[in-house]
Amino acid sequence: MSKKLSAAFLVLAGALWGCLSIFVSALSDYGFDSKEIGFIRISLCTLMLLVIILIRDRSLLRVQLRDMWMFVGTGIISVTLFSYCYFTTVINVEAGIAASLLYTSPVFVMLFSAVLFRERITAQKIAAIVLTVSGVALVSGMLGSSALGALDLIIGIGAGLFYSLYSIFGVYALRKYSSLTVTFYTFLLGTIGFLFMTNPIAIIEKTASNPVVIPMEIGLALFNGLLPYLFYTIGLGHTDASIAGVLVAVEPLVGCLVGIFVFHESVNPAKLIGIALILSAIVLLNIRLSHKSTAKEIPA
C-alpha cells in the first residue's frame, strides 16, 4: 500500500471519529447512557465484521491463545474504557471539549514509550507536554469562571489515556495478524468488557420500545466504529505510529466543528487557542530533528 493511500485512510478515520458526538447525543436523548451506547457500538461492530470475515476468509479468525493479551489491551483496556470515558464527556460536557481532551493521547504515548521502550525524553517532548497541559486548561475552562468539574476533566483526559493504548497494543498485534483480525478481536474483547458494565436485555427492550433509534445504532456502529477502526488499523500497519497520531488529529477539529455548527456550542478565543496548543503539541512531538540538533536529552 502506498504511503499516500495509508495517510488517506488515517485522515478519513479521524474525520469519521470526529462525527461521533452526533450519534452519541442522539441516542442519549432517547435515554441511553454512555455505557449502553458503548455496548451498542462495539457489539454491532463485532457482528458486522464477523459477517465480513466469514464471507471473505474464515482463517482470519485464527489466533494463538498466548497472543490474547494484545486483544485484551486493544479491546478491553483501550476501546471499552476509552468509549466509556469519551461518551460520558460528550453527554455531560460538550462535544468540542470531549474531542479536544481526547487528544492528550500523544503525550501518553510518549510517556509509555519512555517506560516500556526506554525512549529518551527530550526537551522537544517536554515542550509538547507543556503545550498540551496549557491547551487542556484553556479548552476545559480551568483558567476561567466556567471551569469543568474535576471528575469531568479526569474522565475526559482518561479518554485520551485509554485511546493512546490502542496504538501501543495495536503495533504488537499487527506484527503477527492482519488488520481485519486485529480489529475483529478488538471489537470482540471490547464487547466482553462492556458486558460487565451493562444489561444487554435492557438495551434490547429500550431499542424495541423506540424503533426509531435502530438506524442511529447502525449508523453509530458503521460510521463511527467499524469503518474508522478498519481505516485506522490498515493505515497504522503501513505508517509509523507517531505519524498516524498526527494524521488522525483531524478528529478534534471535526469534533469541535460538529459541536459549533451542529450543537451550537459556544466558542471563544480561549477555547480556540487551547485547541491550537494541543494540536501544536501533537505536531511538535513528531517533528524529526536533524542529527545535528543541539536539543538536550533527559534520560527517562
Question: Where do the model's predicted regions map?
Answer:
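C-terminal transmembrane-helix exit sites in multi-pass transporters
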Residues: 48, 53, 86, 105-130, ...
